[in-house]
């Protein structure tokens, strides 16, 4: 195929698609140019069905630093493991694509997005999502697309599609929504306490824009799309399925209805093991034993899947006996751990999360150096999911994509209520340890995080709670579930997480296993989630009504000093010598920003006070009118130099020593002598003039002879008048 180009304008920016020029050995490849962002997407499919009981789809989003004209950091100066943002973007693309493959599809699929040039005002992630769908759609890979995605902002009551960087910074909403022409199938959002009505409207506005992008894709597919390949789907033997269902469905139905998770798992596993043992013995000599046993396992999974869904949709009975809108038993506790800066333990049924707060100086913030300009990240929310939380053994190591994604969701939910840097000048880290899990552990970590922040004295604007909503749909009828547990998540059609305060939503995340959901379902799920969120907030506010007024004793205390920008070098010293000495003496941490704001951190208030003393003296300036007790350090013919404080000297000119004439400075002053002086001038170069005589009362001026004679005569006359008056009085 020769190169073909297609172009349109979307959200005020040119959108250009090129096919047929690069990556021609992939099943499908596109170059998408949106604004000045350029993304190459290549989609590849394996020749044969992969082994395993899952669909092996891999989506990568690779940030090349040259795309932004930057050198990679680190010693190797080469791109390494994906950044957190790249990992989250890969998940963002994976989630709407995955439901668009046929049930039973098991061929391995790789979709690789490479950012070749980067424009901060034209979303490269949205270009990559568009390119991923289009590369699959024009290829011979069986894909039930296309899909597309957009970002939605909300400024001054108006919705903005794919806002630029400045608009996103001003926006009350940061929403990514994806879907097909018919329906939405993925949502990811952070919001500044927006109402359910505004969020729903934003989703619908986003879907309208998505339809425009899908129409453009369909035009391209019609022009250059390949015929789809015939691919083997995983299908079980129909006769074998009918036999197992007839013999064991009643037993499995009974096992599924055991309310307690562990007991239910044991009961269902016992039925499955019985069936597997029977058929393994029955077909022990059959050369297709492996295929038969794979079918047996798949049939049992389908039977459990069907029974859980039937119970909910027909009998309105959930596996643990709850109503469809009922939350599991709740419990909340603060101060679970001593010594730490704050901790909260939140339990909902068999899901439990411990959140631990750590406060630190702003110098400990994470520096993010990706395709955007380098910036400091003040708030971190990390999520850990150990295998013991579900009673299993498994891999331990660095956080995987799921843990990174769940941590980011909690971060978005809680970030909206954090105090500003001016109100609370700390770097903040929350770590969520999932101790027990039976569904919706990410939302439990948000609730535990709220408890830890409030217990630690972080003045958040309002407590945040999260809840996960589920859906069981047969295409015609549907049931929305509140607070889904693991089994309902596994066999259900939707995982819709909603977090927020009493005033509004702060985060959304939705993933579905069907091709899309309607606005009616979204509206119902949001309303049901609000009711559940308020119930959880009642518990949180009962546990701790408001953030504590003080930090934990172990938390670092902070004090600040504002110094002139030109004094920063004095505090730091040559090669950091001065500041290092201060830190060595006091044991504090010191941060100085570009504006001259000095932040001092320590758990010891005395150390903070001493540090303030030292820094204040270093940057202190003599001011006109101030009086100092100074020491004479040098004597010259024209005057004496005195030390006012630290490295600040002043000149006392010979004429400023006394009101009477001073013949020789050395006759009056000597080196080492201490005197009081008053600053009378500071020039533009910082040179200080001081005066001793300004602190001495000025003696009266000498009087002239004529004035003295006149004054004497007047005094004599007054005295005579007084004597005459007294004589007259006596005679009377």
Curated annotation (Swiss-Prot):
Polar residues bias (residue ranges): 717-732
Gene3D superfamilies assigned: GHMP Kinase, N-terminal domain, K Homology domain, type 1, Nucleic acid-binding proteins
One cellular component term from this protein's GO annotations in UniProt: cytosol
Region of interest called Disordered, as start-end residue ranges on this chain: 691-732
Molecular function per GO: 3'-5'-RNA exonuclease activity; magnesium ion binding; polyribonucleotide nucleotidyltransferase activity; RNA binding
GO terms of biological process kind: mRNA catabolic process; RNA processing
Composition-biased stretches (Basic and acidic residues): 700-716
Domain (KH): residue spans on this chain: 556-615
Stated name of the protein: Polyribonucleotide nucleotidyltransferase
């Amino acid at each position: 195929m020769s190169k073909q180009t297609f172009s349109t304008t979307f959200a005020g920016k040119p959108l250009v698609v090129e096919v047929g020029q690069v990556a021609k050995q992939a099943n499908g490849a596109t170059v998408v140019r949106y604004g000045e962002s350029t993304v190459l997407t290549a989609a590849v499919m394996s020749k044969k069905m992969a082994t395993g009981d899952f669909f092996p789809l891999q989506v990568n989003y690779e940030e090349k630093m040259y795309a932004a004209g930057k050198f990679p950091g680190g010693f190797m100066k080469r791109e390494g493991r994906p950044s957190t943002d790249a990992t989250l973007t890969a998940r963002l693309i994976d989630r709407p694509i995955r439901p668009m493959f046929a049930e039973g599809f098991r061929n391995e699929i790789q979709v690789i997005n490479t950012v070749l040039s980067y424009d901060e005002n034209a979303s490269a992630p949205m270009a990559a999502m568009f390119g991923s769908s289009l590369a699959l759609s024009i290829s011979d890979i069986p894909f039930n697309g296309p899909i597309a995605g957009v970002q939605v902002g909300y400024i001054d009551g108006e919705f903005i599609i794919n806002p630029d960087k400045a608009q996103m910074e001003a926006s009350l909403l940061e929403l990514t929504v994806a879907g097909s022409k018919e329906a939405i199938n993925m949502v990811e959002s952070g919001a500044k306490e927006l109402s359910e009505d505004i969020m729903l409207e934003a989703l619908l506005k986003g879907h309208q824009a998505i339809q425009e992008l899908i129409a453009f894709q369909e035009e391209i597919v019609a022009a250059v799309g390949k015929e789809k390949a015939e691919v083997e789907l995983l299908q079980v033997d129909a006769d074998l399925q009918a036999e197992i269902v007839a013999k064991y469905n009643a037993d499995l139905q009974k096992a599924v209805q055991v309310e307690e998770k562990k007991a239910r798992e044991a009961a269902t596993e016992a039925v499955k093991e019985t069936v597997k043992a029977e058929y393994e013995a029955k077909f022990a000599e059959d050369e297709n034993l492996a295929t038969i046993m794979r079918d047996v396992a798949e049939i049992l999974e389908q039977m459990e899947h069907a029974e859980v869904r039937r119970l909910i949709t027909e009998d309105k009975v959930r596996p643990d006996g709850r109503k469809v809108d009922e939350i599991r038993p709740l419990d909340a506790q603060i101060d679970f751990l001593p010594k730490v800066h704050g901790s909260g333990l939140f339990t909902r049924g068999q899901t439990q999360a411990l959140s631990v707060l750590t406060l630190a100086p702003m110098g400990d913030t994470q520096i993010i150096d990706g395709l955007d300009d380098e910036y400091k990240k003040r708030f971190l929310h990390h999520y850990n999911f150990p295998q013991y939380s579900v009673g299993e053994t498994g891999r331990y190591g660095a956080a995987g994509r799921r843990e990174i994604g769940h941590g980011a969701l909690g971060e978005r939910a809680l970030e909206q209520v954090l105090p500003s840097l001016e109100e609370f000048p700390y770097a903040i880290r929350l770590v969520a340890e999932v101790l027990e899990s039976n569904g919706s552990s990410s939302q439990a970590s948000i609730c535990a995080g709220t408890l830890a922040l409030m217990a630690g004295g972080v003045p958040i604007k309002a407590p945040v709670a999260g809840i996960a909503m589920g859906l069981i749909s047969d295409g015609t009828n549907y049931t929305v579930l509140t607070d889904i547990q693991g089994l309902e998540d596994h066999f259900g059609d939707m995982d819709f997480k909603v977090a927020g305060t009493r005033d509004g939503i702060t985060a959304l995340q939705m993933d579905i296993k069907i091709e899309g959901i309607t606005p009616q379902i979204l509206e119902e799920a949001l309303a049901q989630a609000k009711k559940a969120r308020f119930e959880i907030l009642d518990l949180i506010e009962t546990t701790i009504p408001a953030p504590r007024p003080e930090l934990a004793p172990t938390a670092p205390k902070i004090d600040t000093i504002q110094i002139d920008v030109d004094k920063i070098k004095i505090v730091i010293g040559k090669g950091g010598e001065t500041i290092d000495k201060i830190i060595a003496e006091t044991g504090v941490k010191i941060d100085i920003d570009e504006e001259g704001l000095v932040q001092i951190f320590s758990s010891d208030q005395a150390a903070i006070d001493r540090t303030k003393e030292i820094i204040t003296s270093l940057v202190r300036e003599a001011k006109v009118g101030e009086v100092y007790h100074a020491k004479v350090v040098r004597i010259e013919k024209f005057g004496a130099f005195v030390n006012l404080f630290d490295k600040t000297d002043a000149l006392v000119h010979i004429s400023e020593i006394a009101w009477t004439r001073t013949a020789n400075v050395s006759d009056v002053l000597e080196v080492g002598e201490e005197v009081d002086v008053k600053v009378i001038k500071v020039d533009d170069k910082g040179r200080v003039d001081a005066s001793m005589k300004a602190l001495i009362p000025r003696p009266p001026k000498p009087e002239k002879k004529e004035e003295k004679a006149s004054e004497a005569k007047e005094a004599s006359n007054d005295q005579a008048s007084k004597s005459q008056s007294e004589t007259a009085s006596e005679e009377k």
